[in-house]
A protein has these predicted regions:
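Core catalytic lobe of class I
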Residues: 2-142
Length: 142
């Protein structure tokens, strides 16, 4: 969602980390070429990351996120596995979208202490949900 992000590549052809705009870089990858994906997309909560503010119209944000998930499905090998984490508010939408494409193997809860979440008038979320999903539920990368 940020066109100003220039891609940076680490590694060689057999193993690669790409730092760049997710959708732009995903579209460059060949179909069924990736064994494992761990995605931690923006949460769209209005946070400022060095001048880049996560604040989009909800419908546009979900459309962008779902397109990224579609691209991840396209590039994942038949035995591949994808993990995706996001906010507790967004995860129900992500879960529904991913069930259309994948088999959900696990719903993981990453629990942490309250040091980063300070809520005075409500109970703050002290966990983040992670989905583990596969294309083939009997033969997959773990």
């Amino acid at each position: 969602m940020n066109a100003r992000c220039e891609p940076v590549y680490f590694g060689d052809e057999s193993k690669k980390i790409i730092l760049g705009d997710a959708l732009t870089e995903l579209k460059k990858l060949p179909s069924e070429s990736v064994d494992l994906i761990f995605a931690d997309p923006p949460y769209n909560i209005g946070k400022d990351f060095d001048g880049m503010v996560e604040s989009w119209d909800e419908e546009a944000f979900l459309a962008w996120l779902f397109e990224c998930i579609d691209e991840c499905h396209r590039i994942l090998k038949p035995h591949g596995t994808m993990y995706i984490m996001n906010s507790t508010e967004n995860m129900p939408y992500i879960d529904l979208k991913c069930r259309q494409l994948f088999t959900i193997k696990s719903r993981i809860v990453w629990s942490y202490d309250s040091s980063g979440v300070q809520a005075k008038n409500y109970f703050g979320s002290m966990y983040e949900p992670i989905l583990m999903m596969v294309k083939d539920q009997k033969n997959y990368t773990f």
